[in-house]
Amino acid sequence: SFDDNDRFTSVQLQTAAGESQQVSGQVLVDATGQQALLANRLKLRNDNPLLRKAAIWTYFNNARRDPGKHGGATIILHTEKKESWFWFIPLANDVTSVGVVTDHEYLLKGRNSIEETFAEELAICSAMQEKLADATQVDSLHVAKEFSYTTTQQSGDGWVLTGDAYGFIDPIYSSGVYFAMKSGELAADAIVEGFAKGDLSGSQLGKWSGDFDAGTNWIRKLVDKYYTNEFSFGRFMKEFPQHQGNLTDLLIGRIFYDGAGNIFQDMDPAVEQALGKMPLE
């Protein structure tokens, strides 16, 4: 709940036994993931209309991993016509997360059951079929849709958003966990500093959000390029090998420094050329 000045004062909790409890505090951190409880209550969530994607995923045992030191690597595999893509994420105890991602309309509209849809997409991804040839599915299928969003406000007096409650871009580069940890770290620093200064205002608790948004925007741009089918990262890197280090930085989340977006000085025109909107020189 909030007081008359819109400052956070307390939360109403329900225990495992079903009992209701009122807990007061000075700062509320919304780390509720894509449930985004506070962001949804305050109507701060803004879905990205350009990334209306959906995913179907599950878990397998005994999937074929790459040998040696690459056995734990996350792998992205396209279907035949690049209408969708699969993730392959090795986890502990021989469990592998496997999911398919594509446009919401393509994946979930006018199709059969999610089991049949997943099987149909798998049937047009021979590389993933090979990895799952000896695997056993150990969980039911899960569905997520329209998961790309931002928030119009990330902090207020006595509250702050972090992780997926703050926003989510796309699963393609597996950046969500890193951004969740980074935003949590930055929010914690701002809270500690706020207590020391006696300032728990929205501007203090969210003082880091501007720089954070500037960095994550480079990943958002990279995702947009990935979903431009006419554009090829491979061809781009052959033409502009000087950006290899910059691209690597983006892919590993090293985005909070001056020059992190330099690659787009050449990539933006290359995409325009690929789309036929710009003449070749």
PLM region spans:
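Predominantly flavin-linked oxidoreductase catalytic cores and closely associated redox partners
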Residues: 1-132
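Tryptophan-centered motif/residue detector
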Residues: 27, 57, 85-87, 147, ...
